[in-house]
Amino acid sequence: MVERAGWCRKKSPGFVEYGLMVLLLLLLGAIVTLGVFYSIGKQLPLLTSLLHFSWDERTVVKRALRDSSLKSDICTTPSCVIAAARILENMDQSRNPCENFYQYACGGWLRHHVIPETNSRYSVFDILRDELEVILKGVLEDSTSQHRPAVEKAKTLYRSCMNQSVIEKRDSEPLLSVLKMVGGWPVAMDKWNETMGLKWELERQLAVLNSQFNRRVLIDLFIWNDDQNSSRHVIYIDQPTLGMPSREYYFQEDNNHKVRKAYLEFMTSVATMLRKDQNLSKESAMVREEMAEVLELETHLANATVPQEKRHDVTALYHRMDLMELQERFGLKGFNWTLFIQNVLSSVEVELFPDEEVVVYGIPYLENLEDIIDSYSARTMQNYLVWRLVLDRIGSLSQRFKEARVDYRKALYGTTVEEVRWRECVSYVNSNMESAVGSLYIKRAFSKDSKSTVRELIEKIRSVFVDNLDELNWMDEESKKKAQEKAMNIREQIGYPDYILEDNNKHLDEEYSSLTFYEDLYFENGLQNLKNNAQRSLKKLREKVDQNLWIIGAAVVNAFYSPNRNQIVFPAGILQPPFFSKDQPQSLNFGGIGMVIGHEITHGFDDNGRNFDKNGNMLDWWSNFSARHFQQQSQCMIYQYGNFSWELADNQNVNGFSTLGENIADNGGVRQAYKAYLRWLADGGKDQRLPGLNLTYAQLFFINYAQVWCGSYRPEFAVQSIKTDVHSPLKYRVLGSLQNLPGFSEAFHCPRGSPMHPMKRCRIW
């Protein structure tokens, strides 16, 4: 490694020096053994001194680190050699880790990886997803054996998606058929006002889009666990999503103008193409005028919505009321709420109770919606509602419709090329048939032994979280006890649900029993999926909550926490290097999947998760003292991350409010994982070093943690993500969390006042 000014770390010995040390050891025996002890002490000075262990425990940890490294040797297995090569290639050892650890850990990765033309962002996560999709392609295209019905349906759906010649031949025909089903698209037909417009009702239109096409437009009605009683389901009413990814794009700031213009051109082009396909006159001026009205309407809707950073407190969002109160408070110029909701539920043969209650999340939006509805004609409303359905279905049509959105996607994401077809199809099938596809992935690529190993890691990190509560002087004993109870009650799901591999278990086939796919009807297959997903959700209203239900599929590179279930989920897709391998050193496992485990556990105690108790019910279990001080501790982190200015996103600052929950989880996760690793060593765990890397165990832990987040963005997507992503940009996830961790600056000998060892640190958990 190259020495850098201000890098106050002793240079580690190279291979030649190690060879000499071995010879000297044979000759000098005990004398050099003392020297080795001294050398190791110099490499890892006071590694645990600021982790608030007791003095006795601190001594045990340091002794364990010494003994472990003395007894271990360099790992030369294929897995270790691959890990060493990956780490070395990703690093930029010319950079000072105390100045910018992200560049030190990821500089090589950034230098070696160019963002593909199809991607708006490219990262370690994206590469893992790409590799997973290659596996899924193989199993979905494998025709050598017959599978159970659910799996065969997934393969048929995949083949229909790949059947591009038929998709091109059918062109806009399937979409035009759907437009008739939803009452027509006024801008793309003649005489709508005199025909379909005469019997138009907003309530019925919204209900059809919701129940038949899973499009919750204008009003977001959905079924989910009741926040106040997690054992039952309830109807929720909330503000909707919009056609563009963020409400900010609808406003007239200079940097949004290009996106708005491209969006309007996209809308206009699609409507014009559909008119031509029906042999209607082009009517360019009329089409542009009506699509401009649609954009104006959607802009007013965007203005009526509440920014996401102001919606973090679920206790402030939650308002329970019966249908009569809903109607009285939000009449919306005669909008019949009972008719709307009943029409949605009738699709699954569910009847509203006379005293049915709903939970309204979007009160400010509904208060603003009345004036908007009153300002626009039925024609403009229908143009907007159907546009949102058309927008969703563009990807299922022929190539010329995809080409119509090229400029819009370029303005929004910076991409100029569509994803290669097989990847698009693999992703689509996995998203819609996650259990069936997951069963294929598990059989092909997942080691079942990983489940027990990860479960042990969860227990180690959960134990550290509980012990860390004693270090918090901002939290009183009453609240600490409740926090401990909640942490101990967190349930985990690892890898996959067992039933997807059980041939005698009919649940997997029953999950897709209502679906019948055809290889030459990809568009209609997609409509079946939309309807099935919508109705499967709506049916839950009268069903008891299944606490063992998986909220995500197995073939997914991610992890999750559900506050309503107090449950953490680690799909099989993330249980792979660099996150996890039973064949790589434990420093990498703790810095990888260990950090992820700590991250998800901490989500149970972030600015949203803290509002739910050990059973997943929204309940205030905090004392006034602890709640007040939690807010104060949070302000430190909001300020810290809010001061990160991202040059790639036009020098916009990270939104410390909207990213708070993820920042809390990142900070807690890496802190818990590191302490759990030290404790594992102290308890006799024997780790191994990697060949070719003069790095201590602690340094390997932090480098693997950082390299999980290596990645780069296109400028357009950087601008979008800073508006919409609840996560901080990748490099600030690393820098922010490690700046706050004393163990990091100790491991790399960063002087106080250096960028990675700031004078003030933030800590919540």
Swiss-Prot record:
Disruption phenotype: Mice are viable and develop normally. However, males produce smaller litters, indicating specific male fertility problems.
Cofactor descriptive note: Binds 1 zinc ion per subunit.
Disulfide bond entries: 75-80, 98-750, 106-710, 161-425, 636-762
Binding-site positions, a peptide: 121
EC assignment: 3.4.24.11
TM annotation in the entry: 20-40
Main location class: membrane
Cofactor(s) in the UniProt record: Zn(2+)
Coiled coil: 523-549
Entry's Gene Ontology cellular component terms: endoplasmic reticulum; extracellular space; Golgi apparatus; membrane
GO molecular function, one term: metalloendopeptidase activity
Enzyme class: hydrolase
PTM text: N-glycosylated.
Catalytic activity field: Preferential cleavage of polypeptides between hydrophobic residues, particularly with Phe or Tyr at P1'
UniProt protein name: Membrane metallo-endopeptidase-like 1
Biological source species: Mus musculus
